Amino acid sequence: MKPIRFFLAVIVSMLTLGLVSCQQPQEEAQTQDQAEDQAQDQTQAQERVQAMDENGAPLFQVDPFWPGPLPNRWSMQQVTGIHVDHMDIVWFLNRPNGAEGDEIAGGVEEPYRMACCTKSPEVIAMDVDANIVHAWGDADHHPNWPRGLQTVIADRDGYVWVGGLAPQDSILKFTREGEFVWDFGRRPPEGVQMEEDNAETEVLTQKGRFQLDQDEREIYIINWKRVLVYDMDTGDFKRGWGGHGMPLEEITNDPIPPYEWDGTRPPEEPNFVPAMHFIETSDDGLVYVGERGQNRIQVFQKDGTWVQDIYVAEWTPADRLGPTQCAGVTTRKELPVCGVMYKMAISKDPEQNYLYVADSGNSSVWIVNRLSGETLGSFGGNGRYAGQLHWINAIATDSLGNIYTGEVEHAKRIQKFEPVWE
């Protein structure tokens, strides 16, 4: 029997080696097929004409079946960030901080609930058909894993950047498979509460809202009342500016005074008005910064030269009203949600004609003409049914014209809105 067993072992080994040797070409062929399918879909999307409403706003409709339940009984939690990469892979953060007691269960402590729901990886990537291609990350994944996850960006070089807003959170760089590569650092000392100092560029808090400029190899970070730009490879500081392009040393470190809401736009303020909630860059070299405290987008050139202000739903009570009049995600539930500028995405048509503004205050996505700043229309509306929105806190677009939204608080989901074609 021993010679027979040996012969069988040799045969199995040879077959295994054959499978391994064939696996890489098969994977490469699959990747090539996906790229070809993506190019074909992009061509078809460009050839079709998207339907418009009477005001010239492009029309969208929700796909009520996308993405469907997550695999492995993973619990869908707060979707705080979404990014669609150059291959139309949708990356999103599934932050479990606000999980209810009945939403994540099972394990050793609750074996009687194993059929219910489990904690998922906190970084998930799926294709346009909701097939999961990557999933990794949590507090056990890396010792400095962000506790206040806010932003995920997958660059075209094959790396994924993750950042959070907790005091000790920074920006971490991983491979697409989740292998750690680099830590931006610049954390304050443990347990030290930093006082606002808008001229300080070496030690930073709340670095979780950032953007990458891969052409210039730069990281844009917003916090307090400024934009800071660092080298994307070395982390060295390069430049920064405040509201309307003011120098860092001229930015006030005092709180922006609240105002009495009267149904009109907040009083004009040259400084950025916290919370600064997003920063995006366009292909023609413009930088867009959203201020939840002012219902305003300030537009700049990359050197910090101010270009224009864009107000959206300016009559909305702004976050500048303060905590006595505005709700938080987990606190002051009896109060309304304040502010418009939660996140923003830029359309991926060749001219990048539209800004899509995710507005939690009005549970809507506003469609804005990028060059004129004119609001053309909106979709959404408060609720938890498909196509409605509640505490929207993330938005992204792909090359096919789809819009992806993420919700926090108790909504806890990601949705896909598809173009309506004529």
PLM region spans:
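Bacterial N-terminal signal peptides that target proteins for export
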Residues: 1-8
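Hydrophobic helical h-region of N-terminal Sec-dependent signal peptides
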Residues: 8-16
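C-terminal motif of bacterial Sec signal peptides marking the signal peptidase cleavage site
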Residues: 18-21
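Eukaryotic scaffold repeat domains enriched in small/polar residues
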Residues: 23, 28-30, 41-422
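Intrinsically disordered, low-complexity repeat regions of secreted/extracellular protein precursors
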Residues: 34-38
